[in-house]
Amino acid sequence: MSSYFVNSFSGRYPNGPDYQLLNYGSGSSLSGSYRDPAAMHTGSYGYNYNGMDLSVNRSSASSSHFGAVGESSRAFPASAQEPRFRQATSSCSLSSPESLPCTNGDSHGAKPSASSPSDQATPASSSANFTEIDEASASSEPEEAASQLSSPSLARAQPEPMATSTAAPEGQTPQIFPWMRKLHISHDMTGPDGKRARTAYTRYQTLELEKEFHFNRYLTRRRRIEIAHALCLSERQIKIWFQNRRMKWKKDNKLKSMSLATAGSAFQP
């Protein structure tokens, strides 16, 4: 990453030593030697080495050696981040790393940098302190506002589930039509003598089975599966129903033929 960073930078800008890279180190090397970003020509490099926009104000860019990278990476949501940067610039007017007069130093709990030479020796650490405090306070303010906005909405939303819960039992009981009721109702699956209870069919199921039997008294397995899916029955139930229906049909035809035979013999001379 670092080699790609240096090579791309030196290829784009021939006078690379004029633009020294910032010092990314630990906290101990925070006050080390680094080039002031405010002293660099902002008009000559509008974009960073890898294409990020670095055209920011001098006061915010010189706040800390993390300021240039952090603000340029956050440059695309400009509307959401502008109040945070404005607060940072208004709290500390940083003209150069040597003199750091802070107007709101007491409010942030830090000393003015012009008080002692030891404070002047560490300008980067104090300026980083201010920006971090500003960012923390700016990020906490929207969270508090969001929590205050969400609390009344939650209070309003609480009565609604109660209303829906009262209406839920009414909606859970569907309307039962007469053709949906079973003709032979037996809640237990065993009959009075311990045998399996008679299968109860609804009027709709019986009507559909009677229509199918009217067209064809014998079913193929494919047609039986289709009827089972359509009527929410099992193949075994449909097979047994057709067997019983054929027996009934045979009995009816036998009685009809016998009655016709007796009627015909009665009219014989």
Swiss-Prot record:
Record localization: Nucleus
Tissue: Expressed in a broad spectrum of tissues.
Biased composition (Low complexity): 89-103, 136-158
Pfam families, sorted: Homeodomain
Example of a GO cellular component annotation carried by this entry: cytosol
DNA-binding region extent: 194-253
Domain of life according to the entry: Eukaryota
Membrane spanning residue stretches: none
GO molecular function, one term: DNA-binding transcription factor activity
Any single GO BP term: endothelial cell differentiation
Record keywords: Developmental protein, DNA-binding, Homeobox, Nucleus, Transcription, Transcription regulation
Polar residues bias (residue ranges): 113-130, 163-173
Antp-type hexapeptide (motif): residue ranges: 176-181
Disordered, as annotated region: 75-173
Main function: Sequence-specific transcription factor which is part of a developmental regulatory system that provides cells with specific positional identities on the anterior-posterior axis.
Family statement drawn from the similarity comment of this UniProt entry: Belongs to the Antp homeobox family.
Family matches, as PANTHER family: HOMEOBOX PROTEIN HOX (PTHR45659), HOMEOBOX PROTEIN HOX-B5 (PTHR45659:SF2)
Protein name: Homeobox protein Hox-B5
Source lineage: Eukaryota, Metazoa, Chordata, Craniata, Vertebrata
